[in-house]
């Protein structure tokens, strides 16, 4: 009975089609007095502009492709109508819709033939769908085979024909049809199956990929190559019969050996790409005012704005954008290699960031040892206690700026207590009066506490406000912060960004991975627009660089030293050896390295080998 109802439905559909067609083309007085079909369809079927999901692209500093980003699992490279080879157009016209340029969205005689066949075979198999109907189905409807869906498809097809030219419909169709394996459109099919652009395919190769959409599962060349080849030959014969190619060209195309070269999609630099995706959201947020709205919002309102931002970013990615970055592939490979080779024990991890402080560009990132795509990225997601690496920013910098001290100025390094807070030097040692140079390169704690206490907590913290440490909270404004005691801490990237101040005469400009974002036609959509902030005077900055130079020459960071125009930095160790840091700079680069365990526990057993220092040295030495 079910099959009988379906067949009767098709017969009824055939009866309705003439009435439908008559209403479309009639101009009689009686019809004009009726409410027009156009008005009914316009009211009930709102055709949105054809907007196809497209791939987005990410490039390194030299313009080489780094990553192709597929949205909604639709791998699509949009090819304009005038760039689609004539052979491809003709293959689909001859095989799918010979009367495409003549009908108004549906082919009545074709449906008669299909219905007769369905009645004869007692099944709904042939639908005689035109290219316009197929496009309607791909864009707006399901692929269910039923009478009601078919009638709806006709209405949508009629609307499409009203709104778009035939060439626009054919272009959209050729960019929406499915080629299996997550591939949509003729452009992506050429790239996926042959690893070359559509225009570079031979006629035989074009016909081969064009064989797939008729039944993507059956004609999947990765699983059923012979089936695909057989259909390719039928399509080529159809081209010859239509006069598109000659008999000689047919024989040559059929004879050509098809060699698939399936595109290998791999992110060579997952650590860096992961961050760029995050920074892209930041860039959109700042450029379109989401950041200011988020600062004022809270609770459900904040969540709503965050969802709006996420939707906006998703839309941009679906529309297709080109993201240009400062990625230096050589330095990226260096930092990844160092991280993978210098961290012993399976549970020991790390994160690192490398910035060219002359250009304010993030050129390399390591998200961790043996980092894989979608892993937790420790370079920018791991908030850890910075230990003594905070001292140049929060203690020594403000103190020298406020007092006019120099590296040879002296300070008390004896015991210090403020109420119940009595910090100790390493190994509980006590010292007398020492120079700032001695205190800094040996990382004495009590002098740093005294500096913060002398300057004043509020005043000292004002020096680090321009860095916008994301998880700095009010409860951090206490003396323990002088030694890196924060509620949440900082990420390796945050610390590295802050240290670029020392490479720029005390001036700070935020560093970024993204240099610009354009649409697929090259129009610039977004660029960072940052302003410099003078954190320390040139004089203070010179003193700080001298102090940091002493660290690598004769202090706690000696293992990081190599021959370069300038090297300086600061080590850092948090309480109970949960975190080990080295953040430093050369004349060109600033780099920060953190080593520890994801679940904070002691790594004191690594103190003697100091992997954070060897990773830092191994990475930057390769640049000189």
Curated annotation (Swiss-Prot):
One of its GO terms (cellular component) is plasma membrane. GO terms for biological process: cell wall organization; peptidoglycan biosynthetic process; proteolysis; regulation of cell shape. Disruption phenotype: No visible phenotype. Double pbpA-pbpD deletions spores have greatly decreased spore outgrowth and peptidoglycan synthesis. The N-terminus is blocked. Its EC number is 2.4.99.28, 3.4.16.4. Keywords: Carboxypeptidase, Cell membrane, Cell shape, Cell wall biogenesis/degradation, Glycosyltransferase, Hydrolase, Membrane, Multifunctional enzyme, Peptidoglycan synthesis, Protease, Signal, Transferase. It comes from the Bacteria. Its main location: membrane. The active site is at residues 96, 388. It catalyses: [GlcNAc-(1->4)-Mur2Ac(oyl-L-Ala-gamma-D-Glu-L-Lys-D-Ala-D-Ala)](n)-di-trans,octa-cis-undecaprenyl diphosphate + beta-D-GlcNAc-(1->4)-Mur2Ac(oyl-L-Ala-gamma-D-Glu-L-Lys-D-Ala-D-Ala)-di-trans,octa-cis-undecaprenyl diphosphate = [GlcNAc-(1->4)-Mur2Ac(oyl-L-Ala-gamma-D-Glu-L-Lys-D-Ala-D-Ala)](n+1)-di-trans,octa-cis-undecaprenyl diphosphate + di-trans,octa-cis-undecaprenyl diphosphate + H(+); Preferential cleavage: (Ac)2-L-Lys-D-Ala-|-D-Ala. Also transpeptidation of peptidyl-alanyl moieties that are N-acyl substituents of D-alanine. It is a peripheral membrane protein. One of its GO terms (molecular function) is serine-type D-Ala-D-Ala carboxypeptidase activity. The keyword DNA repair does not apply. The keyword DNA repair does not apply. InterPro entries: Beta-lactam/transpept-like (IPR012338), Glyco_trans_51 (IPR001264), Glycosyltr_51/Transpeptidase (IPR050396), Lysozyme-like_dom_sf (IPR023346), PBP_transglycosylase (IPR036950), PCN-bd_Tpept (IPR001460). It is found in: Cell membrane. Residues 1-21 form the signal peptide. In the N-terminal section; belongs to the glycosyltransferase 51 family. In the C-terminal section; belongs to the transpeptidase family. Cell wall formation. Synthesis of cross-linked peptidoglycan from the lipid intermediates. The enzyme has a penicillin-insensitive transglycosylase N-terminal domain (formation of linear glycan strands) and a penicillin-sensitive transpeptidase C-terminal domain (cross-linking of the peptide subunits). Has a partially redundant function with PBP-2A (pbpA) during spore outgrowth. This is Penicillin-binding protein 4.
